[in-house]
Structure formats: structure tokens, C-alpha cells
Amino acid sequence: MSGSYPFIDIAALDSVREGFARGDAQLVLAHDLSTVLWVNGPGAKLFGYNRVEDLIEGQLDLPVATRRQIAAFSSENTSAPSAVAVRLGGGLRSELTHLHVSNIKLPDGVAALLVATQMPDNSAEAAISGLGDDSTHIALVDAVGKVVAASPRFALLDISASTLEDLIVEAGDATDRIVKRRIRTGSHSVPGAIARLTDTPALHLLCIVGDAPAQFQTAAEAVPLPDNAEAVLEEILPEQGDAPAQQAQKTHAEQPRPKTFAFDHDAPPARFIWKVGPDGTFSEISPNLAAVVGPNSADIVGRRFSDVANVFGFDTDGSIAALLLERDTWSGKRLLWPVEGTRLRVPVELAALPVYSRDREFLGFRGFGIVRPAEAEADPEEIGLALAGGIPQNRKPRKEPAETARMVGEDDVLALSEEVANDDQPAAVLPKPPLDITPTPGRRDSDKVISLLNSCAQEKVAADQAKFLKEKERATRPEGGLTKTERNAFREIAERLRKQGLANTRAESETPVSETSSIEPVEPTPPVKTRSEPIQPDETALLANLPVPVIIHSGDAIHYVNQALLDITGYESLDDIRSAGGVDVLFNSESDDGETRQSMLLRHADGSEEPVDAHLNAIAWRGGRALMLSLMPVTAADLPAPAELPAANDEEKQALEAHVEELKTILDTATDGVVLIDPEGRIRSMNHSASALFGYERDEAEGKFFSMLFAIESQRAAMDYLHGLSGNGVLSVLNDGREVIGREAKGGFIPLFMTIGKLPHTRGFCAVLRDITQWKRTEEELTNARKEAERASNQKTEFLARISHEIRTPLNAIIGFSELMADEKFGPIGNDRYRDYLRDINRSGNHVLALVNDLLDISKIEAGALDMQFEAVSLNDAIGEAIALMQPQANRERVIIRSSFQSNLPDIVADSRSIKQVALNLLSNAVRFTAPGGQVIVSTSYELNGDVVMRVRDTGIGMSKSEVEQALKPFRQINALERRKAESAKDWRNEGTGLGLPLTKAMVEANRAQFAIDSNPGQGTVVEIVFPPTRVLAD
């Protein structure tokens, strides 16, 4: 097991060992989220690898969305695992996997990320799966030295039970839970290590590094080679004379790349990626273009498109330059690109997509192009020679058969693109598919733009792959299909053809091409049949005897058909098919009614048609390349059963047609957009509202993929929603809709709320799209209003705090000097009126200071910035202290204060200072608003439901409901001029600041209690404060 860290060192970490013992899938990544530092067997299997060695110290190409989710959770500076749900896989087979991401420290202190998830198989064998080879042996050992699970060759080491027991004792005594030393195996010792994974029950991981005994190695290595091994080796490796194979491989590996560029006229079409900035400057271009037109001709990074067009002489009408200024999606633009070192120029087709940032800032264009070297034409200006710095030497590149070049890139009637061809086709012969799902280290994000521009093609590939998997899983076929023996024979033949094609391609690429300054004419020799001939007569005979119809063709040229195809189509021979029109006459991809079928239609000689399933493979054929198309007739059991409709007479038919027209009219009248989708995800039809919403005509949108209606960032969510409904899963029951971003025909974006439902008979879907632009605008306005209110509150709090500081200093001076003068410490004042003035000054200063304090407190409470020290508070003691402070004022006002405290009242969780302030405010108001001779009663109680209640009741003048509401608002005082008591009672409600009750209510709610007031004019007021059971410290 390779890696920068020993496998057992990371397996013994506290955050890893228990999950390893359970059989969880675990992966340790560097913070670049690409480099794999460590992985166990289930973790390697989760990401598609069978062996741990295949992934450790490698590059893991996670999807962009998965990287973004993991990076968001890994940015938190905590070691606690965070749960994240990601999709692993691709297309319709992607599965939602719940991962746990946590930050860990490696043995050398380096920070890393641990990604783990539970696996269904938690056996001991699964925990050590993917580990162990001829020189590395792994085992799980329990507390008594019993081997619970082990790698296949572990038993050959012959480790005694006493040795295992000693290792277990040593691992239990080690502070780091790991012991590394030489371990006795049979008659010799080898390096090894043991780590204690769990304690209850005890489980240990044992790693041995060393070869098995020689007698076992001999038996294991003496495995006979296959009969065709020599032939396979001769096909794969080029002949090197008498030199050893190792020296030949070394020479080939060290062979330098050619310094000069040679144009290959017969090369297949090649795709390349390009990107320009907002000013039209090329910022990126893939090397595929340089491989066709030369490195100097493709060296355009850092140059503006207009400058390149002027130098190379294309886009003379300025159409592409104008499209770059419009910032809209475009495609199908053709230009002629000069080829370095030649007098030729090749056609290039370009397409581009505008790129915007999250803030809708235009970042430029990302696009792809297709260069077609087989269609090269003469360049009258000979720009390619200038790019090479002169006329190059006459070199003739090795040519492939013309049929192969013509085969690639053609839009034949089979409608099968390179994306659905065999995945094993050589890249040097057939063009790379637009969506490469093979993990590639260091892959740039711009390489994925093709999948965005070709979303339709991508979904077609996914649909074809799903159909192919369904065909593979079918155990038996009805009459007319393949038996199990026939299917196995057919697959074996296809595999042999494919492997021979790969061997020929590899041999041709590894054969060195020697350059000669002059070529001497030689006598022509007859062609000699070499051993690399792809198809032998016996294999052709096997194809001829298969019951499966087979066609070998290149583009429109048919090379071979077997007897099964002639029987099913009714033709007498291959010449009859060629004379009738070739491939065009055999297939029809659309039915007469224009509906696109999931299967193809094979046309017979008499004009009748039959649905078939087609599978395409790239093979080697008579020294060149060709495509092998195998056909499987679709029986009635495979076709979807049409919905049975009862027979209807003319009147019922007319009624049904009228009803359908009414429903169409209703749909067109609805303000929401309605789109009908077929099972393949294509648009069947849409109503007038949807057509107006997206700016597409009905005929223009029909037949195109549903994903075209959405912005790039919403296409995945929309298609996942659609696929989730097709699977009869949770989404089909809990259908709550999705918020997506729609894309207009002119490139604009619309926020939409989409709801999709299933159609029962056609297996299609119905999508209802509602424009929520106004909702989003209202939501944004409310958010802005909330932010503005919070900002105003913060400004008010800051202003009050600042003004309070400025007012306190002079107020303290006024109050202090007035008290000093009233005491006459430096001499008599001499006049009683001056003494009264000083007392008024002191009283007024204290009043202003109390007002400032109340303003600051209520602003802090509203802003949530009041410092609260929650602790156990005795409510009886707090109220008693407040009564003691208010008793002198009550005596002056001739008001009686009575108390009724419940004994054994439990403490409450509250802020002691604010509780005392609440009691003082309530008692002060009760005394002030009670006439002489009245009473104020303060009581506490412990209710049966666990509440602690404090009540303050007075016999004062009381208030009406409207006056209570006004009194609870800041800076509002009750106008008592209209209602005064006729007798000697004095109405004190005109005094004060109007902050008493609002401040009291705010303090009560800040202590998580409930404030209630009940008052009636002339009957007094009752204030009740209830502390819920969650704030009561009951025994």
C-alpha cells in the first residue's frame, strides 16, 4: 500500500478507527479536495475502485456541486462531523449519499478532511476489502487472538496464536494504540504493525509486510498463460529486433516528441474548448485545436478575436464579432482556419454561451468548436506557410483509410452519435465524446462547458444507456430474441473484435516513424496478409451464423451483412441493399405521425417497418476501422401497451373532440404556463401562457428537451425533479414543487415556481410554471425593509448611548453642586427661597438622569444588547427589597403597602437587577396613581401547572382598555384632564416620562416571562407577571 502516510497510522487515529472497524466507507482528502491521502476498501469501492492502491495518492475528480458542498462544511473550524447529502455517480443512475465531513489532524500535524458514510455491509470482511496483495497481508484480530477476517494470503504466514496474544497485550499498553516491530512468521520474522481499533469489544488491525513462504509462492505463480497470450503480445508490442522488451519500452518512453508539426488530412473531426473574456480576448483554448492546425496557428491566448480574425482572414463580414458584443447564446458559425506549414485551411464550426457571475456581471463567453481536417481546402493567401516560418520539408503523414475518416462526424440516418458508441474506441481514431465521465486529475472547469451546451445530447446519452442496461437485465427474451448461449457467443465475438482493434491502434501508435530526406522508388509489391488482420474468415463465419442481424459499415458504405439481416429485411444479397440505397433505405428514425420512438424502425424490402433495438460498436475491419451495428427485434411484450379506449360512435367521438377543445381553451386561458413532456424529457406541447412566458413559438419548442427552458444553474434541479417523479419514489408522493430560474428565448431570466405531475396513460409529465417575479420583488423589498429597520434601531441605540454619555457629565455636576450648596458647608445661603430653588434643581437633575437611563435601557432591550446575568433569583426577596425602598414614599402619600408571599416559593432563572427594577417600577406606579387611604397589595404564588406568578394590585383610579394600550407605548402619557376625581384624590398620571410601563414590559419579556395588565376605571389595576415552568428551579 503506497502513500505518504503508513496505512495503519491513519487507521489508528481516534476519528478514523471506530468507523474503520464498523466497515464505514472512509476517505481522507487534502484541503484541495482532489488529492487522496488515505482510503479504506469500502471507501475505494464507493468511488468506483476495487483496490485501495488505485486511489491512494491519486486525484479524485469530484463533481463541482459535491466539491462546493464539502468545501462549505470543511470551512468550519471544528472537529465535529457535519452531515452533507451529495449525489455520486452520473446521469439517471446517480444516488443521493449522506456523507459526514470532519476536520482531522494527520500524524505529522497536517490538517486534512475525513469523508465517511455508513455502508450496508458492515461485516469484518468488508472492512478490510480492497487490502492485501502478495507482499502485504491484513487481518482483523479480536481480544483473544482469533482472526476474525484476513486477506487471502494471510494464512500462509503461519503466525502462532501466542505471537498474536503478545501483540494484543503490547497494543493495549501502547499510548498511541500502535505497536510496530518484527513479527515471527513460521521460521523467520518480517516487519509488521498492530493497532487497537476498538475497546469494547476489542478489535485489532494487523498489517504484515513480507512475502509468503517460497513453497506457496511457487504454486501461486505457476499459472499457465492463455493459449492466445503470445498472439496478443505480438499484436500489442511492436517488433524491436533482438533488443530486450524492457529496453524497447524504455526507448519508447524516452522518445522525444516531434519538434515539427505535420498536418494529417485524413484525421477525424476534433472538438476543442475555447473561452474569451468580456473584451473579446482569448483566455483559454484546449490543445485539440493545436493538434490539428499546428501549435503556432492555435497560439491565440491573450489576443483579441478581432485581431486574430484580421490576421487569419476570417469573419470578414464581422458577424461573429457582432455576436460577441450581443452577449447571447449562438452556434453554427463557420470559418476557415489556416493550417501551420501548409497552403491549406480547414473549416471550423464555433458555438458559444455567455457566462455571468453571481452578481450578473458579464464574464465573457465559453464555447466549443469542431475542426474538420478532412474538408481542408486551398488557402489563396498561404497564411499557414507564414505561421511555420517558411516552406516545410515534404513529409507525408501516415494515413488511415478514407472510409474511417468519412465515417466519423457524419449525421447518418441511424441517429447514433459518438456518445453512444462503445466506450473502448481509441481516441486517435474516433473523436472524443462531448461529455467525458472518466475521472481526470487536474481537469479544468472549462472542459465541462460542452455538457452545458449539449444538454440535449447528454440526456439522449443517459436515456440510451438506461435502455441498454434494461436490455442487459432482461433474463430471457420472447420468441424471436436471443437465447442465453447465443447472447454469450455474440458478446464474446464483439469483445474479441474490440480487443483486436485496440491492439492494432496501440501497435500503430507505438511504431516509430523514421524520416528520410529522399525516397527511392521501389517496385510495387502485392499486398501481404499480416498477422494483425482484424477479422479472420472463421470470425466472419461466426457472424454469419448468428441469429442476430449484424451490419458492418462506415458512414453510408456497407461492408458486410449477415444472413439474419437478409432474412429479416427480405433482401437477397448485400448488392441488393446497396443498389436500393444503402443505410438510408434500411432505417427510419421517425414514424409516419412524426413522433420520435425510443426504438429504431427497420424498413423491409417491401416497404414495411419493424421496431428494433440497435447497439453500436467500433471494430477493426480489414486494415481499417468500421462500425458494427447489431439489431434486436422488439417484440410486442417490449412495446408499451396502448391505453384501451372503449369503442365510441360518431356522437360520442364528436363530444370527446369538443371536450378536448374546451380543455385546450381552458389551458390557453390560464395565466400559468403549462408544458406537456414525453417520457424521454422532450416537449410535446405548451399553452399560450408558456409560449409567451419563454418567448418560443409552439412549433419551435416542440420536440426539444425540457431542460432548454431553464438557466444553466437550474437545469440539474429541474431534471432531477423530473427523474424523481418517474421513479415512483418519495417525490411522486411528496410533490411540493421547485423554485427554478427560467431562460427566455432572447437570453433573459425569469424566476419560476414549477410543479410537475405524471400523466397516467402516456407515461409523460405535465409541468405547471408560475412567474414569481412579483413575489421575489416583494420578498426583496421586505428584506430590505427589515435591514433598514435594524439599521435604524442600531443607529438609535448608538445615538442614545452617545448622548447619554454627553448628558451624564453636566448632570452629575449640577446635581452634585446643588446638594453641596443646599448643605451650606461653605456658609449660609441666607434665604429660604434659594434653598427651595436648589432642591428643585436637584430634583429636576435626578429626573433627567433617570429619563436618560430609561431611554438607554429600552433601546438596548429593543436591540437585544442589554447585558443580562441569568441566575437563581428569590422572587420574594427581590420584591421585599423593592417594598422597603418604596415604603417611605408610600407613607408620604398615605398609601398602605401590603404583601402576601407564598412560603417555599422556588427560585426563578432571571436577571436579579432587572427583576428588582420591574418591582420598583410597578410599586412606584401603583403608589403614584392611588389616592390617599388606598392600598397596594403585592403577592406571589406557585401554580399547579408549575408557573410562578407575581401580582401587584392597587385601588387607584384605573384605566380603560384604550388607555392601557396607550400607556404601553413609549413616550405616551394618558390625558387625564378629561377625567379627574371630584374629591381630594390627585391624579399623578400627568407626571413622569411615559417610559415606566413600556420599560417594565420589555424587561419582563427579556427575562422570558409573560406580562399582563388588567384595569378598570375607578376600580384599580392588576399587573400580573408569569414565569413559565422552564424558568422555575423546582426541587
From Swiss-Prot:
Q: Which SUPFAM superfamilies match?
A: ATPase domain of HSP90 chaperone/DNA topoisomerase II/histidine kinase (SSF55874), Homodimeric domain of signal transducing histidine kinase (SSF47384), PYP-like sensor domain (PAS domain) (SSF55785)
Instruction: Give the catalysed reaction(s), semicolon-separated.
Output: ATP + protein L-histidine = ADP + protein N-phospho-L-histidine
Where is the region Important for polar localization? 1-613
Q: Where is the PAS domain?
A: 659-730
Q: Which GO terms describe its molecular function?
A: ATP binding; histidine phosphotransfer kinase activity; phosphorelay sensor kinase activity
For the region Interaction with DivK, give the residue spans: 614-1035
Q: Which UniProt keywords apply?
A: ATP-binding, Cell cycle, Cell division, Cytoplasm, Kinase, Nucleotide-binding, Phosphoprotein, Transferase
Question: Keyword Lipid metabolism, does the record have it?
Answer: no
Q: What is its main location?
A: cytoplasm
Write out the function statement from the record.
Functions as a polar differentiation marker. Essential protein that, by localizing in the old pole of dividing cells, controls cell division and maturation, probably through control of DivK phosphorylation status and cellular distribution, which in turn regulates CtrA, a transcriptional regulator of the minB operon. The asymmetrical localization of this protein is probably required for cells to enter a new division cycle.
| PANTHER family for the chain | OSMOSENSING HISTIDINE PROTEIN KINASE SLN1, TWO-COMPONENT HISTIDINE PROTEIN KINASE
Q: What is this protein called?
A: Cell-division control histidine kinase PdhS
Q: What organism is listed for this UniProt entry?
A: Brucella abortus (strain 2308)
